[in-house]
């Protein structure tokens, strides 16, 4: 499993070809300081579910739901949704029975596929009913999460009106935004009422990327205790651009725009598949500032797709490029710590298969002296990446944000279809660094 973080299985891509392209992340079941991180792939489809509706889609709003809210649980292989039945096929083809795995010490030749579906969660979990009962005590630790995931996926495709995705537009001039947590953010941004935990899970999974960025940069950031003195200096510089003095145009009404802030999203995967209009929720937090988002990394675009730049409006520009960052870096030229910021979402810097590949990119980013914020999918993942950066670049950076749990992590679990015992919530933790600055001192003896 160690090589699966960056792997995109061709068979899975074919089976789910009707969905948006897949993005992977590593996942584990339980955060633990002493456990070994288990690396797996995670399919994530966003565009097909959350793309904005066009004028020709009005008819879909009056269709009767496929599933009612009291009929969301189905065994995967018997689901009325073809895509979910495909998941059962993938699990049976690529998964293994955990009891067989334990009995045969990981010898795949002796293990059987999970054909028996748990009656409580609906997922194929064991090779037979006998092994299901034998391993039920261990399975019960994840069964509730799997059932929740089963119902969430059916709900997304149930055909009901998804009121929770009717996101608010620009914030009123005199209406303050509070970034304490998801609940307070939704309330102060006038989101539709979240009537259930399921609504919260759906929306948080979609918005965890733009709002994680916004929560770090916003003046009401919840990370005041974790920000270091060097971090205060970096954020003060950035916020001097994001929060300028209110200057109006000649018409006396329109606020003048600030300089453009560049966000470099290195190793981009799931975040690069978000429909562009979702990033408006970041833009609305800083109404005077244009953003240019650079999605950079080998998984940003499908193979053989040429890099390109597109615009949503005059305040949101997107560039997509499959280059490694240390190659892309040379295209930029100069950098400004006031206007350039790095974000790395669960990059796997400390993973053995990717550590060497990350070294030159991290070094180039540190050379710019611009702020860099990094997330991880659990505590162990965060600590693994921190350890790798400290060992490889320890003399070259200052801490700006100490590792902490992300207030805007995804509340929805992502499940590894190759090993159902592994699940995570995206962007569980966050930390930040910046290239070390050296103070210039004056030696009076030289006078």
List the predicted regions and their residue ranges:
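N-terminal alpha-helical interaction blocks
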Residues: 40-87
């Amino acid at each position: 499993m160690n090589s699966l973080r960056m792997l995109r299985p061709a068979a899975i891509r074919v089976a789910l070809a009707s969905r948006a392209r897949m993005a992977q992340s590593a996942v584990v079941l339980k955060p633990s300081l002493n456990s070994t991180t288990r690396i797996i792939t995670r399919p994530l489809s966003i565009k097909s579910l959350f793309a904005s509706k066009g004028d020709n889609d009005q008819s879909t709003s009056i269709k009767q739901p496929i599933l009612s809210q009291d009929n969301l649980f189905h065994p995967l292989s018997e689901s009325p949704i073809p895509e979910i039945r495909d998941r059962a096929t993938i699990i049976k083809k690529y998964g293994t029975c955990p009891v067989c795995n334990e009995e045969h010490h990981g010898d795949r030749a002796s293990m059987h596929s999970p054909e028996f579906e748990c009656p409580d969660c609906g997922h194929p979990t064991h090779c037979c009913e006998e092994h299901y009962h034998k391993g039920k005590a261990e399975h019960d630790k994840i069964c509730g999460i799997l059932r929740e995931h089963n119902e969430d996926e059916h709900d997304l495709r149930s055909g009901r009106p998804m009121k929770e995705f009717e996101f608010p537009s620009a914030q009123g001039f005199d209406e303050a935004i509070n970034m304490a947590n998801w609940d307070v953010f939704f309330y102060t941004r006038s989101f539709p009422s979240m009537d259930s935990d399921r609504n919260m899970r759906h929306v948080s999974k979609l918005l965890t990327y733009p709002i994680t960025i916004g929560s770090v940069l916003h003046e009401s950031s919840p990370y005041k205790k974790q920000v270091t003195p060097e971090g205060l200096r970096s954020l003060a510089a950035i916020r001097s651009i994001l929060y300028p003095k209110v200057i109006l145009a000649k018409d006396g009404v329109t606020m003048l725009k600030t300089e453009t802030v560049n966000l470099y999203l290195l190793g981009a995967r799931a975040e690069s598949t978000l429909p562009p209009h979702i990033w408006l929720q970041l833009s609305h937090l800083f109404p005077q500032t244009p953003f240019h988002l650079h999605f950079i990394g080998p998984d940003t675009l499908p193979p053989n797709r040429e890099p390109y730049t597109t615009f949503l409006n005059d305040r949101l520009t997107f560039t997509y490029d499959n280059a490694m960052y240390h190659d892309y870096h040379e295209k930029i030229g100069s950098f400004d710590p006031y206007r350039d910021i790095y974000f790395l979402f669960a990059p796997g810097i400390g993973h053995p298969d990717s550590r060497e590949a990350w070294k030159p990119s991290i070094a180039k980013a540190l050379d710019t002296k611009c702020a860099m914020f990094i997330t991880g999918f659990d505590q162990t993942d965060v600590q693994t990446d921190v350890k790798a950066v400290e060992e490889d670049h320890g003399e070259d950076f200052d801490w700006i944000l100490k590792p902490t749990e992300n207030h805007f992590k995804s509340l929805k679990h992502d499940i590894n279809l190759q090993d159902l015992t592994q699940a995570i919530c995206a962007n569980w933790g966050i930390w930040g660094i910046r290239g070390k600055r050296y103070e210039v001192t004056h030696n009076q003896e030289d006078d």
